[in-house]
């Protein structure tokens, strides 16, 4: 799926930076929202700033950036603004199988200097008390996505080795921990993921939180890829945001983990063990 934005603005007003992924709070940016099932069960948000820094996640009551998709971005600056081009593999997306599909879509652009957010679809009806923004999205008609093939299996092996030496006792020890992550698209909708002896030590560290004299247990955002895919199935909306049915951070050091997510009609399901 190819998407391109031509953003018109005086070059001297462009605000952009090279930062870590999903951190575009102080930059200009463009993005696309994709509701591939047309029922608001999963809305992808994919964007970038003029420097090519990516942002992606699940759109909804709040934008959840724990989901990291694989896609390419190419940017360029012109004398009339900037251009951002996206190349999004269908293998990175979950969608229904069939011809002549209608996907819901919205295009967005953020202006940092003017503190503005521009949508292709204007939410005028929200002023009238209609809170459902995603169900008012525009349509891409006649989409014929390819069927997910079994040879699109993704393997991510890793090996962590450690060596220590105790000079006081004149002893040494070493440790080798292999691990393997398998992502198997059973179909365009169903996804099987297997993690064998997963190593989460390379995941970005958590933000520091105050745990002194707190009434409730601290809640940390899930950053591990195995648990972020399909995370929307284990939470539901409330008036104050998301309510988690399952807090995956309580799973600390599994030997083997298996997850299967899919969709039948308008019913989404997920099983994790």
Language-model region placement:
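Structural preference for beta-rich elements and adjacent junctions enriched in aromatics
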Residues: 1-273
């Amino acid at each position: 799926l190819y998407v391109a934005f031509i953003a018109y603005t005086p070059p001297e007003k462009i605000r952009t930076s090279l930062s870590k992924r999903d951190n575009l709070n102080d930059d200009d940016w463009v993005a696309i929202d994709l509701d591939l099932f047309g029922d608001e069960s999963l809305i992808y948000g994919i964007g970038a700033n003029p420097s090519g820094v990516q942002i992606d996640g699940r759109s909804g009551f709040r934008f959840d950036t724990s989901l990291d998709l694989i896609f390419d971005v190419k940017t360029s600056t012109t004398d009339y603004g900037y251009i951002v081009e996206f190349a999004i593999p269908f293998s990175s997306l979950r969608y229904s199988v069939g011809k002549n599909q209608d996907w819901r879509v919205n295009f967005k652009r953020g202006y940092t200097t003017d503190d503005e957010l521009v949508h292709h679809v204007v939410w005028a009806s929200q002023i009238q008390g209609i809170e459902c923004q995603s169900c008012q999205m525009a349509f891409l008609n006649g989409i014929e996505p390819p069927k997910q093939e079994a040879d699109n299996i993704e393997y991510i092996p890793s090996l962590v080795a450690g060596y220590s030496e105790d000079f006081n006792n004149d002893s040494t020890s070493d440790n080798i921990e292999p691990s393997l992550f398998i992502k198997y698209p059973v179909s365009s909708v169903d996804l099987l993921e297997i993690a064998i002896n997963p190593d989460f030590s390379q995941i970005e560290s958590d933000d520091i939180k105050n745990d002194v004299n707190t009434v409730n247990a601290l809640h940390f955002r899930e950053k591990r890829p195995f648990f972020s895919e399909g995370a929307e199935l284990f939470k539901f909306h409330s008036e104050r945001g998301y309510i988690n049915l399952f807090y995956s951070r309580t799973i600390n050091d599994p030997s083997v983990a298996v997850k299967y997510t899919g969709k039948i009609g308008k019913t989404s399901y997920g099983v994790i063990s």
